[in-house]
């Protein structure tokens, strides 16, 4: 997630915001949404080096989903965390998609892809095998197994 490990979660929210071109007011506007979504409790004020990998993922996802990106890249975000957090992520991704943001969703979970995507690209050995509907991509995948 590209965190500064000696900085706190809160400091990393601002660092990521600055790196993405946001100013103090813009970051302050989304700060509480990030904190609430990440749900790290008191750990938000602890150095990121004390976080588990799941906690880092939660904070990274919370930052990236709340900055209102033009393109959102989600790489296996739904493979970690408990079922409640995974559902919260799916719901938030669907909210972002509904606003017209392009989402590049990378997953090995058939269910997650079917619930999230309207288009899929099936890659094998780094080459595009199918670029079409989710059903077309899975049909091709099932035949190649």
Predicted regions mapped to residue ranges:
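Conserved ABC ATPase "signature" region
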Residues: 14, 26-43, 60
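A short, proline-enriched helix->beta-strand linker immediately N-terminal to the Walker B motif
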Residues: 65-74
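Helical segment within the ABC ATPase nucleotide-binding domain
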Residues: 86-99
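H-loop/switch region of ABC-family ATPase nucleotide-binding domains
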Residues: 107-108
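A short, surface-exposed alpha-helical micro-motif characterized by mixed small hydrophobic
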Residues: 113-115
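Conserved ABC ATPase "signature" C-loop
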Residues: 125-126, 141
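ABC ATPase "signature
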Residues: 131-132
């Amino acid at each position: 997630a590209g965190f500064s490990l000696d900085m706190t979660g809160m400091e990393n929210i601002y660092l990521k915001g600055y790196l993405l071109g946001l100013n103090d007011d813009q970051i302050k506007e989304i700060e509480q949404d990030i904190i609430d979504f990440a749900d790290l409790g008191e750990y938000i004020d602890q150095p990121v080096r004390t976080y588990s990998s799941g906690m880092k993922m939660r904070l990274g996802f919370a930052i990236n989903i709340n900055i209102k990106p033009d393109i959102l890249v989600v790489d296996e975000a739904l493979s970690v965390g408990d079922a409640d957090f995974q559902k919260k992520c799916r719901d938030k991704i669907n909210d972002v998609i509904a606003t017209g943001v392009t989402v590049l969703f990378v997953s090995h979970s058939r269910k997650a892809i079917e619930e999230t995507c309207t288009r899929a690209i099936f890659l094998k050995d780094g080459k595009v095998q199918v670029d079409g509907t989710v059903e077309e991509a899975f049909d091709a995948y099932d035949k190649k197994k």
